Amino acid sequence: MSRTAWRSYARPVPTIEQSDRINDVCIVKPDKYGDERGVFIETYRRSWFPLGREMVQANRAERQAGAVVGLHYHLHQADYWTVPRGRARVVLHDLRAGSPTDGATLCLDVDADNALGVFIPPGVAHGFASLTDLTISYLVDSYYNPSDELGVAWDDPAIAADWGLTDPVLSARDQANPRRADLGANVRPHANLRR
């Protein structure tokens, strides 16, 4: 296929599902296009996502198997995650007071083979377990702001997450996160968060 033909090849919109567990979370199931050279996957398009969010920064993290990162949450920032290498157990928990899904937890496996993307709105706590060595890529809709980088305990029984690991490695920061019941009113997210 010529370079011009490749560019003009019409690609359908991937399957984008609203989570039935947590409001405003979207799971993207992209189409894969392959030929003798390999595979092409469109992983992000701004028009796919709700809330009029525009991603402004791309980040990449690499973790060894056995690590848990999180749970983190933001009052203002949305995230979009993909896992181009390895396998992650993604854990999401709705912390938003007033949300019809407040208190719900969603766990899903995201990896290079299924190529899923996960849109995470503000107020939804998020983390992942490295089931293998992995690379996680994430787009965010605001620049890093330490005052909007909050956390909740990854092992809180009220969250009841299945991380898929028995003895994970965590950062000191993530080990010190408070339980959901101990979050102060000033850091508890609310439904319909906007910038």
Regions found by a protein language model. Give the residues of each.
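Non-catalytic, conserved peripheral segments adjacent to functional cores
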Residues: 2-116, 135-138, 142-195
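Conserved metal-binding segment of the jelly-roll/cupin
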Residues: 110-132
